């Protein structure tokens, strides 16, 4: 638990700085408090998950998966922001290439955190054999995310909220669907206990 607590603080600290960097053009108030507050929130969340896992064992592993996923999201956005801020390119084919690069960097980060921390999979299986499986599961997760979002936004009639809110809701539901797929795929395919 002590190692996990320290790692959750590290994730929280790195995440805080990535939020500050990637949101520098958004003028978010009080963002400078994040390096102090966010690591503590991550650690408290993991401690709560630890105690909840006494009743539902999967909760603790899922909490670590969510922390890693949040970090991966921020790495994705930060790498994309770095490429956009440094080139001024905000659309077109090059911007799509930037997005592909940021996705790949986030997947590499995700692989190592999930392998060695979330799923504690320390087998000496070759990384060159595991990573393609991991990338395949992640890519299927990406396709699920886009597909669910497309169906939600384009095929389900809008009700109660405006179109922008509907699109955001679709993105949230799509992300949850992809999160479930990725968790199950990593747990039972890539890092399955033999």
Where are these predicted regions, by residue range?
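Alpha-helical membrane-protein topology signature
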Residues: 1-194
């Amino acid at each position: 638990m002590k190692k996990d607590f320290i790692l959750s603080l590290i994730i929280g600290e790195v995440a805080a700085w990535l939020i500050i960097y990637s949101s520098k053009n958004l003028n978010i108030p009080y963002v400078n408090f994040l390096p102090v507050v966010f690591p503590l929130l991550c650690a408290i969340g993991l401690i709560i998950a630890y105690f909840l896992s006494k009743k539902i064992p999967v909760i603790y592993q899922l909490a670590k998966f969510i922390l890693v996923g949040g970090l991966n999201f921020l790495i994705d956005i930060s790498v994309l922001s770095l490429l956009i801020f440094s080139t001024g390119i905000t659309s077109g084919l090059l911007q799509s290439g930037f997005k592909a690069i940021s996705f790949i960097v986030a997947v590499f980060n995700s692989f190592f955190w999930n392998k060695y921390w979330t799923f504690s999979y320390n087998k000496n299986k070759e990384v060159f054999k595991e990573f393609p499986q991991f990338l395949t599961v992640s890519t299927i997760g990406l396709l699920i995310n886009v597909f669910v979002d497309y169906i939600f936004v384009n095929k389900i009639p809008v009700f109660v909220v405006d179109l922008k809110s509907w699109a955001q809701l679709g993105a949230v539901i799509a992300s949850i669907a992809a999160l479930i797929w990725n968790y199950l795929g990593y747990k039972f395919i890539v890092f399955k206990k033999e």
